[in-house]
Amino acid sequence: MINSMPYLHKNLRLLRLLSSKSSPFPLSLRPFSPRSFSLSTLFSSSSSSSSMENNEATNGSKSSSNSFVFNKRRAEGFDITDKKKRNLERKSQKLNPTNTIAYAQILGTGMDTQDTSSSVLLFFDKQRFIFNAGEGLQRFCTEHKIKLSKIDHVFLSRVCSETAGGLPGLLLTLAGIGEEGLSVNVWGPSDLNYLVDAMKSFIPRAAMVHTRSFGPSSTPDPIVLVNDEVVKISAIILKPCHSEEDSGNKSGDLSVVYVCELPEILGKFDLEKAKKVFGVKPGPKYSRLQSGESVKSDERDITVHPSDVMGPSLPGPIVLLVDCPTESHAAELFSLKSLESYYSSPDEQTIGAKFVNCIIHLSPSSVTSSPTYQSWMKKFHLTQHILAGHQRKNMAFPILKASSRIAARLNYLCPQFFPAPGFWPSQLTDNSIIDPTPSNKCSSSNLAESISAENLLKFNLRPVAIRGIDRSCIPAPLTSSEVVDELLSEIPEIKDKSEEIKQFWNKQHNKTIIEKLWLSECNTVLPNCLEKIRRDDMEIVILGTGSSQPSKYRNVSAIFIDLFSRGSLLLDCGEGTLGQLKRRYGLDGADEAVRKLRCIWISHIHADHHTGLARILALRSKLLKGVTHEPVIVVGPRPLKRFLDAYQRLEDLDMEFLDCRSTTATSWASLESGGEAEGSLFTQGSPMQSVFKRSDISMDNSSVLLCLKNLKKVLSEIGLNDLISFPVVHCPQAYGVVIKAAERVNSVGEQILGWKMVYSGDSRPCPETVEASRDATILIHEATFEDALIEEALAKNHSTTKEAIDVGSAANVYRIVLTHFSQRYPKIPVIDESHMHNTCIAFDLMSINMADLHVLPKVLPYFKTLFRDEMVEDEDADDVAMDDLKEEAL
């Protein structure tokens, strides 16, 4: 892995960090440039100061005793110029018109959590087409070994967060595959242009050069998008019917019906008939006849036509994909003239007649069950209908089984920090019981019926002999009891370990259990702010703990701050955040969590930290429609505003934006003093001031101050005193955040300070984080790499495990939680327990109530027992190299 990294010499030795007495930070760290990176000079002793000075001159920055190491060019955003420019070429390959295998398959994004629209894979021997790319598509495909690198085209049935939330991550992943990177054609209605404009703020333009928008058309005829020897794919634009008082269509209203038509299968060539009856000798003329061309007989003065020597052709199958999001769309669908040629009746059951074999309905159940939609479905008498829209069916069986298995194991070991996931309620309702239909391999009888879609359900198109429904790939359902039985069989002593953990909440037993060395090292002095703290004060739910891109076991960054009846906050919002909320709280509980969001804070513009934001905002706007409420405040880096402004042309996001640099301590002080908002990135005296040269950006101080006042009001209403952003070292405009609770009265009536929480975002360890974390109650710090991979941490401006802990130790933090692990550590990262006495590692869906914070480090050794048989690196982690390439694309 080290050998493949750009800018680093093959034989880099492990970095040696020198102690510094003059700095509050325990490490002596200095900036470096990848172009001149040399460990021998970078970490030279004081006797080789001349070489350090030469290095500083090259970097254009000064070094001091309290400087720190980071990748300067990456932090400034200039490292992109060091990378080889990629020209993402479209794949070209020889097609196979016969296509021995062809099928349509349901990819179950959104099937258990209803957070996105389902995706559909149209598979051929040499081509792959995907319809819709909702959030979680990559994660689902990784788990089920569906190679995204084989995808040729992506079609969107609508352009919105529900159908395209996973598209940015998909494009970034494909851009990082292979030597040059790959690109696909992305098709969608005219609204696709708005989405492309929005994504330009954080996705390289090269990754989007093959986006294709279409319609609306002046004619009712289908718009042909793809027409080759394999398949013809056409689009029919669907606009909602509006009443006269309605203002008309708006962006995001357009929907598409996709018509996929396979070519006919030619009849069998009758060699004997051609030779003996029509006098055509074997040779090139046989091929011409089979390709549909007439030829002259070699023995008679006649013209021989293909129909003379070939059996009857079989019509090619037809598949429709219908996304009808509202009943207004359904009314338009019912009256579409362009679909009339595809309708069938009982009188048309002639052998060899062409008809629609399968319709995959992406429409929600509220629409498909309406009288209008049901009447439209009855126009297809020979068609298999697959209902793939949102239905409350099989809800208790998660589609991401790998991560669900880990969640169930953690819940058994420590339910206090890992409550039962929302998809495994204690009692199942009738509508969550699995479909009793047997999983026979395939059935082609009685196509004129409707069935509910399931994960990986197929409709076989070819071979003709097995055309029809195929359930052979549907995964077996997974229940929590099965996972627990499996766990007890593998690790019998885990039952005793679970009982031991329960005793941490037993006050009387806690007096004796401290005798264990590990536990005795934990800080047992409870901070005043946690004295008699109520369980409904604050709970931290870590929704995603992985870096770069979603994996089988870890989703990307998101932290939900639950203030219970007062409201909630969200810190970062990577792809799939809504799905994770629904896995934690259940469908209805997650909706309530989204409703009560008052502020969303985003650390930086990298895609793994914000591409789930639009889906959350759009859903909140929908849930609160018609209810008196205030817009949610989004605090983020300035480039994020460009994305949100462009995206709002598609969906109503109902939000108010505030730049992170307007929420620094200096800006808040300016608000209090009646001055102007501060726009500088680093505080006076920071060593970073000599490194970063930021051009001033004009700010409308009146609007900033107004938004700051609104944020201050929101904080007061939810029981918080401060939300303060501080700059960190990762990429341009990267931030961490401090959140402070309001004062409260303790058990003896005294006013005591509220708790203080700090989140680092993505960052190298730096003095700004140490200062911001001073005496914090809890620090959540990224720990992307294990200690042995310091070179990679430096090159990518991330932290190692020990570096993150050292930040917390230098700041006298009470508890440290490590997160944002490289996906090379699929289940549990490499850790050294010797220096983690007040630290714990995070897992997806981990819930830390402030009343339990004192117990947190005590459970860490038990995690190692739980995962003792697991490999440190996972063979199926979609290649660690992909993690690195994705990071480069960002």
Curated annotation (Swiss-Prot):
Supply one GO CC term from the record.
Answer: mitochondrion
Residues of the region (Disordered) are 46-67
E.C. number: 3.1.26.11
Q: Which domain of life is it from?
A: Eukaryota
Q: What cofactor is this protein dependent on? A: Zn(2+); Ca(2+); Mn(2+); Mg(2+)
* Location of the transit peptide in the chain: 1-44
- GO MF annotation terms: 3'-tRNA processing endoribonuclease activity; metal ion binding
Q: Which GO terms describe its biological process?
A: tRNA 3'-end processing
InterPro entries registered for this protein in UniProt: RibonucZ/Hydroxyglut_hydro (IPR036866), RNase_Z/BN (IPR013471), RNZ2-like (IPR047151), tRNase_Z_dom (IPR027794)
The record's note on what follows loss of this gene reads:
No visible phenotype due to the redundancy with TRZ4. Trz3 and trz4 double mutants are lethal.
What CDD domains has UniProt attached to this entry? RNaseZ_ELAC1_ELAC2-C-term-like_MBL-fold
Q: Which reaction equations make up its catalytic activity? A: Endonucleolytic cleavage of RNA, removing extra 3' nucleotides from tRNA precursor, generating 3' termini of tRNAs. A 3'-hydroxy group is left at the tRNA terminus and a 5'-phosphoryl group is left at the trailer molecule
Q: Where in the cell is it found?
A: Mitochondrion; Nucleus
Short name of one Pfam family:
Lactamase_B_4
Write down the Gene3D superfamilies for this protein, in alphabetical order: Ribonuclease Z/Hydroxyacylglutathione hydrolase-like (3.60.15.10)
User: What keywords were assigned to this record?
Assistant: Calcium, Endonuclease, Hydrolase, Magnesium, Manganese, Metal-binding, Mitochondrion, Nuclease, Nucleus, Transit peptide, tRNA processing, Zinc
Q: Outline what the protein does.
A: Zinc phosphodiesterase, which displays tRNA 3'-processing endonuclease activity. Involved in tRNA maturation, by removing a 3'-trailer from precursor tRNA. Can process the mitochondrial tRNA-like structures (t-elements). Involved in the processing of small nucleolar RNAs (snoRNAs).
- Subunit structure of this chain's protein: Homodimer.
Tell me which PANTHER family the record gives.
TRNASE Z TRZ3, MITOCHONDRIAL (PTHR12553:SF74), ZINC PHOSPHODIESTERASE ELAC PROTEIN 2 (PTHR12553)
Which family does this protein fall into?
Answer: Belongs to the RNase Z family.
**The protein's name in its UniProt record:** tRNase Z TRZ3, mitochondrial
